[in-house]
Amino acid sequence: MTHDVLLAGAGLANGLIALALRAARPDLRVLLLDHAAGPSDGHTWSCHDPDLSPDWLARLKPLRRANWPDQEVRFPRHARRLATGYGSLDGAALADAVVRSGAEIRWDSDIALLDAQGATLSCGTRIEAGAVLDGRGAQPSRHLTVGFQKFVGVEIETDRPHGVPRPMIMDATVTQQDGYRFIYLLPFSPTRILIEDTRYSDGGDLDDDALAAASHDYARQQGWTGAEVRRERGILPIALAHDAAGFWADHAAGPVPVGLRAGFFHPVTGYSLPYAAQVADVVAGLSGPPGTDALRGAIRDYAIDRARRDRFLRLLNRMLFRGCAPDRRYTLLQRFYRMPHGLIERFYAGRLSVADQLRIVTGKPPIPLGTAIRCLPERPLLKENA
């Protein structure tokens, strides 16, 4: 059977594309292929409520594992509670919603060849489609220079209520090591909490055992005892420099990359859910029979515009990674979280105004002026990948 849209990978980006397509065009036959045996319990996708359009927030809120009305941060010289909603989605809930929408997911499907017309599985089966998108995770690109956000999280069932009422987006009062380090907390119930040791590092190597042990150490320091029920890990790109036009010139043929594979993530935070929702809207908004090249053009236009709007965010990353000593990186975030509430929300949503940008860099500089000036050019960092 020929499908209208074939999505390689059944993760976040393609899951949201499937939901959007089936909602906008219920006549389309949408197929997702993934090599895994089923949805992973090793992924938690979170975002702030204002990061999403009202339609996407309404669509995803019922699917979320948890929703919270507020959040907080903690630094050595500053702590703050923010009245901004926050929520988390897991792989099982997303996969279930995709199937209920009428799209098909085929697990245990190892793709040997993916092209603009379809996929050939390792078993020899050929699947044709009108449009083919590739959302099988991040790949290095000479057009994208990155640092890394690395984490290992342990979810524990505590013996007694842990007493954490809201997400702790960053607890940077911990010892700084391997770059900017903080603990991220998600309290899913009074006795269930995810504790994630996170590092903003120059290198992408991840010592799972060490970071898991650090997460357990944090729990003990809080007086929490209990059993580990789940673990997750991640190595996310943090964009320092990006040539979107060059990237898409390299992808002028073949399947269309989406998700992390296309560099669709918030440059500073690494959050990918809001950008995935925006791309899903682009895909679902096209009229007529779906075609790989038509989708390529629309997604490329979105990508180039998004990269242009994110230039300032990449500058902030260059200041963080190239302009600040690793053990002092936390001071930039500590200063940022003294900014107005609305500015912080717009930062996470990728909607900073020019006035917001000036507010962030005005005043006592977080790094020496000469160092900041050296961080301005983006092109030299791309040459590192040449």
Curated annotation (Swiss-Prot):
Pathway involvement of the protein, from the record: Carotenoid biosynthesis; astaxanthin biosynthesis
Keyword terms of this UniProt record: Carotenoid biosynthesis, FAD, Flavoprotein, Isomerase, NAD, NADP
GO molecular function, one term: lycopene beta cyclase activity
SUPFAM superfamilies, A to Z: FAD/NAD(P)-binding domain
Flavoprotein keyword on record: yes
Source superkingdom: Bacteria
EC primary class: isomerase
The keyword Aminoacyl-tRNA synthetase appears for this protein: no
Cofactor: FAD
Functional summary from the UniProt entry: Catalyzes the double cyclization reaction which converts lycopene to beta-carotene.
Family named by the database record: Belongs to the lycopene cyclase family.
Protein name, entry field: Lycopene beta-cyclase
Organism, as annotated: Paracoccus sp. (strain N81106 / MBIC 01143)
